[in-house]
């Protein structure tokens, strides 16, 4: 018989930098998960993506075991890295903070494809472009 999922915990953690301190420790401690076991496994799995924030979905079972799925980094994080900026614009309709080439947007869309609800790369590109616009980033051809 399959194990029963008791709780699903969603977190966004910097790649390779999970530790028992907040926010990871309290979230997993409440679910009764072995925190150090999760941290070691997560850090090993994400060590090649240093510098990015990785969303993770942890399924906790009734016997306190767990499995987790790492997702692709948020589009905003990938756009900030591509544009070389620290944060988006506070007033994206007035202040533009950076420009990104369309081929870079395509690259980000292809990276995000598994997690986006898009039929093709063109649709994924439109989603990423919308995120860029709301951050005050201009898309160039």
From Swiss-Prot:
PROSITE patterns: RIBOSOMAL_L11. Keywords: Methylation, Ribonucleoprotein, Ribosomal protein, RNA-binding, rRNA-binding. One of its GO terms (cellular component) is cytosolic large ribosomal subunit. HAMAP family: Ribosomal_uL11. NCBIfam families: L11_bact. Forms part of the ribosomal stalk which helps the ribosome interact with GTP-bound translation factors. Belongs to the universal ribosomal protein uL11 family. This is Large ribosomal subunit protein uL11.
């Amino acid at each position: 018989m399959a194990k029963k999922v008791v709780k699903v915990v969603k977190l966004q953690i910097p790649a390779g930098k999970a530790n028992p301190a907040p926010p990871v420790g309290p979230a997993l401690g409440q679910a009764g998960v072995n925190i150090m076991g999760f941290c070691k496994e997560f850090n090993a799995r994400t060590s090649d993506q240093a510098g990015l924030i990785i969303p993770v979905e942890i399924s906790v079972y009734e016997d306190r075991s767990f499995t987790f799925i790492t997702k692709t980094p948020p589009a905003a994080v990938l756009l900030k890295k591509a544009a070389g900026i620290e944060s988006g614009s506070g007033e994206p309709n007035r202040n533009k903070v950076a420009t990104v080439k369309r081929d870079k947007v395509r690259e980000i869309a292809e990276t995000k494809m598994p997690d986006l609800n898009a039929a093709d790369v063109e649709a994924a590109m439109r989603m990423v472009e919308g995120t860029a616009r709301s951050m005050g980033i201009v898309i160039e051809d």
